[in-house]
UniProtKB/Swiss-Prot annotation:
HAMAP family: MfnA_decarbox. This is Probable L-tyrosine/L-aspartate decarboxylase. It catalyses: L-tyrosine + H(+) = tyramine + CO2; L-aspartate + H(+) = beta-alanine + CO2. GO terms for molecular function: aspartate 1-decarboxylase activity; pyridoxal phosphate binding; tyrosine decarboxylase activity. Disulfide bonds: none annotated. SUPFAM superfamilies: PLP-dependent transferases.
Amino acid sequence: MNEQGLSEREIFSYLENAKSEDTDYYRVFSSMCTRPHKIAIEANRLFIEANLGDLGLFAGAHKLEQEVVRMLGNLLHASSIDVPSGGLCQSSVCGYLTTGGTESNIQAVRGMKNLVTAGKKEFKGTPNIVIPASAHFSFDKVADMMGIEVRRASLDSEFRVDMASVEKLINENTIGLVGIAGNTEFGQIDPIDKLSEVALENELFLHVDAAFGGFVIPFLEKPQPFDFKVPGVTSIAIDPHKMGLSTIPSGALLFRSPSFLDSLKVSTPYLTTKSQFTLTGTRSGASAAATCAVMKYLGYEGYRKNVQYCMELTSKIVEEARKLGFEPLIEPVMNVVALKVPNPDLVRERLLKKFGWNVSITRTPRALRLVLMPHNSPEDIELFLEDLKKVTAEIKSP
C-alpha cells in the first residue's frame, strides 16, 4: 500500500489494465458461469453494503433472500419453504443463499454428519458418503475438512452413476448418498429416483448437487426427476450465478427438513440474531438482491427461452461437428458437449494458443468439453469449428 493515496484516474487506469488481462466470454466454451444479466448487476450495486451475516441490520436484504429461497423452492417442487429469521425455521423446507456449489455441498454433508451424530449412531469405522465418480471436486474438500471417507461409485456407459456400484459401497458407516443433476464434465443427470429408493431403503440422506442443472433441467422439454418431487431427496444445491444469470457469488442450499439447519446452528451472542447456521459469517446481501431481481424479471418464460437458446446452440455444435467427423461421447442431455477428437490435450492447447479459444478436457475418457452458454452465439460456433478443423488437420499431418 502507498504512503499517500493515488488519484481516482490512476486507480481506474490501474484497474482497466488488470481488466484487460481477463478473458472475454466471447471465446469461452469452458465455463459454467456467464455474464450476469444487466438487471442483476444493477440490483447488486444497490445492495453492495448489505451484510446477510447480521440480519437485524439489513432486514430489507434478508426479505430478498427469503423471497429468493421461496422462488427456488417453488422451482424445485418444495411443498413449503422458509428462510429462518433469528435462527427459527417455520415451515417444512428451509434454505439460505451460499457462495456457490462448494459451500452448499460442504454444508449438506456437514448437516448429514451432525444429524447422525446427534442420533448417537455408533460407527465401527470412519463415517462415509457414497458419491459418483463424476462428482465435483468440492467433495474432496468435504473429506479433508470433516474426516469423512468419500466412496466413489463407478459410472455406466452413459456417464451416470452405476446403481450396482452404489449399493456395493454402502456399509454400516454410510451416512448419505450424493447424486449429480448436471455433472460438470458431461452434463449428465444421475438416476435420482433410483438413488432415492436406495436412500430410503437404507435410511440414508440424499443430497443432489444441481449447482449447474438446477436452472436447466426444469426448463427442458422432457425434464428428468431430480428435485423434491423425488421423496428421498433431503437437500439440493443450486447456483443462480450459473444458468440463473445472477452475479457471483450466488449459490443456494435447500433442505427438506428444518432439522438440517438446526444441526448447523451456532450461537452468535454479539449479533442482532441469537444464532447462525451458515458456513460463512459475513454474507453478501447484494447477491440476494441480484438473484431476486433477475428471477422476477425473467420468470419461468425467460428462463425457458434461455435454456432453449443454449440447447439450440448445443444441437448446432453437435450437428456441425459430426459433419467434420467428430462425434459426441454421449448425446447431450443439457448444454454440455464432450467431443471425441484426436489428441484432445494437444487440440485444446493449440486452440488456445493459436486462436484464443478456451475449452476444457474431460478426465476419463479424454475428450474436448464444451459448455454452451448464453454468452455464446451461432457465429461463435462456426468460427470455433473452422479453427478446430484447422488444428486437427495440423495434428494429423504435422
